[in-house]
Amino acid sequence: MAKSKPLQIGKVSIGGKRPAFILGPCVMESEKFVWRMAKRIAEICATADVDFIFKASYDKANRTSVRSFRGIGVREGCDILSAIGRDLKMPVTTDVHSPKEAELAGEWINMLQIPAFLCRQTDLLRAAAETGRAINVKKGQFLAPWDVRNIAEKLIAFGNSKFCFTERGTTFGYNNLVADMRSLYWMREAGYRVIFDATHSVQRPGGAGDSTSGDGVLAPALARAAMATGCDGIFMEVHENPVRALSDGPNQIPLKDLPKHLRMLKAIHAAVS
């Protein structure tokens, strides 16, 4: 299959000559927090001369424990993201979990993200597609890379070809994932635009009993491997203080380390392009 044309989301091109980055905290911990993170990441990316889409979740709907923090809700979250995108002049993305959420988020959000566990939910895919927005589908931990063809066929049948896939690891026994770099090759070979999610790929699902743990120290290494293997962009969740993060702290990259990781990833992309 011929390679898809670049997917343009605001000023960011996924599948173009420059690598795209999707960056931001796991969850909106508060309005002040998400604004602070957006501004700081924007400054870092401007200095590094990289193109990025700002990501933050308004609801973590699949938390391991009922006691875990989930977020601030779809309406408030989308209002905040819309304002960030408008005022800071950057495209924004967030994940949607139901057809109704897709419809609501589609009014404000540049790119809708389909969670990995929901990647085959036809009604959700239809609702997201019918917004006309770009769609980033997280490949389920249970799917082979060639199985994304069925998801692509659904989205195209629903009238939307503005989508990409994100590799975020494959189930590897209990409480563990493995990042198979061959997946990037096979999905791109099939003609799809492909992002690599470095931080979720190092998760240990349920590894802390009532929450997910992970090996965040490995996320930059996997990002470098993915860029060298060949992908259209890198997804990384970052936090100003991962130890105190309200969700996915063990996997997020410290904000202070983001500049050096971006420099390295840009250099690798230049070397293999």
Placement of each model-derived feature along the sequence:
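Catalytic alpha/beta core domains of metabolic enzymes, predominantly
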Residues: G132-V238
